[in-house]
Amino acid sequence: MIALIAAVSAGGIAGTLLRFATTNWVAAHWPRHFYAGTLAVNLVGCLLIGLLYGLFLHKPLAPVELRAGLIVGFLGGLTTFSSFSLDTVRLMESGQVPLALGYTSISVVGGLLATWAGLSLTRF
């Protein structure tokens, strides 16, 4: 159990640091498009969860520490629904309602498509 907790913790730290770096880099380079960093990590996370889920379906003997460390830890730290929600509210409050609706649509539909694409990549 300690190895499992350590794997999830290490994955969470890595995913969180990558999200922090990505969103800060985007905000520094494109301050008007602050939401793009959250969108990027969420879409990449969706692609990766589909890919990892598909790989682990074909390799069910992969250690539980590896599966949990990557999916629960790393991807849980990388992706974020709360930041997505805050970004959407900020866009709406600044009067950018069409952009907020587009961002929400791209996030949800893009996330579903990215997850499907990741899973599909394991089926060839």
Swiss-Prot record:
GO terms for cellular component: plasma membrane. Na(+) is not transported, but it plays an essential structural role and its presence is essential for fluoride channel function. It is found in: Cell inner membrane. The keyword Transmembrane applies. It catalyses: fluoride(in) = fluoride(out). InterPro entries: FluC. Na(+) binds at residues 76, 79. It is a multi-pass membrane protein. The chain crosses the membrane at residues 1-21, 37-57, 69-89, 99-119. It holds the Pfam family CRCB. GO terms for molecular function: fluoride channel activity; metal ion binding. GO terms for biological process: cellular detoxification of fluoride. Keywords: Cell inner membrane, Cell membrane, Ion channel, Ion transport, Membrane, Metal-binding, Sodium, Transmembrane, Transmembrane helix, Transport. Fluoride-specific ion channel. Important for reducing fluoride concentration in the cell, thus reducing its toxicity. NCBIfam families: crcB (TIGR00494), PRK14234.1 (NF010830). HAMAP family: FluC. Belongs to the fluoride channel Fluc/FEX (TC 1.A.43) family. This is Fluoride-specific ion channel FluC. It comes from Pseudomonas putida (strain ATCC 47054 / DSM 6125 / CFBP 8728 / NCIMB 11950 / KT2440). The gene is fluC.
